[in-house]
Amino acid sequence: MRYHALTCIGSFNTRLLGAVAAAATLLAPVYAHAQSAPMLTKALPADGYYANSYPPGAPFRSWLDMVSASQAAQPNWMTPLVTVTPRLEQEFRYDQYDQKNGTGSQGNGQRLISYGGPGGARVELIPSYDWEVILAPPPYVTASGPKGMAAGFGDWPAFLVKYRLAYGNAEHGDYIVTAFFQMTDALGTDGKISTNVTTAQPTIAFGKGWGDFDIQSTVSVQIPVEALNVPGGPSAQTNIRNFGDPILWNTAFQYHLFKYFWPELEVNYEHWSNGEHVGLTQVLLTPGLILGRFPIGYDTPTRPINLIIGAGYQIAVTANPVTQNNFVGTFRITF
């Protein structure tokens, strides 16, 4: 049974919200065709997206032309390992997490191995000029430790939608500001795999580049909207209350070196003003290296398909953390 924090509605409404948001985003190009085109920094072919809507017989090519123009108008940085980039991306992405939680009073001591990472094995799409939608199945997670052994699907990252507010490529200021909205649905898997709380997460993201160096940052709050009753465990109301409203601030400092090398250092900050971790501030440092973009093919004669790989290691630098350390690996194919 689920308990809704506001009106006691069921989980169907959460899934319906996700479906409506995803459908609206995917249909955005239909609306976009009726609008005047934004100022572009890259010319499009005569049969491109803004020349004549979707030309008969070439809708896929026309859509890719639009995606190319959209990405050419923003900074060309690499997506960090943990911080969600404010850039609009179009790619398949798979992450691997091996996380060890803290053993003090704030942690539960569990080791969680996530196949897909918290975002799941996901597809990121740019359906219209300033929009991105991320869709993913739940990640598969194994757990071991003092809270028991378990395996199953982690909480479902139902959708994440981005809207780009302001931006300029390297020739026009090298900056970007983007708004996100994400819903994550609790699936209730044992072994502390699930939080048992469905959350909404509004985010503001921004970045600035100076030559080969850039900073990308996000600030967000996780808002619990409903929760599960755990058989033999906490009630849904208790799970809502324990979760709190944590504030997350992630920042990546990144440098581009020798064409394919992107070393970075991320600072991952989280603070709980209420809930079971009330008063706790946790900071993780994540040094990492991303390699790419390696061309492995072409969508169109001018749009490459790229391979990206990377790895990093998160480690807590504050006392009594919820998360002690975490190995992060990433594999991506842009298209």
Model-derived features with residue positions:
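Cleavable N-terminal export/targeting peptides
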Residues: 1-60
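Transmembrane beta-barrel domains of Gram-negative outer membranes and organellar outer membranes
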Residues: 34-335
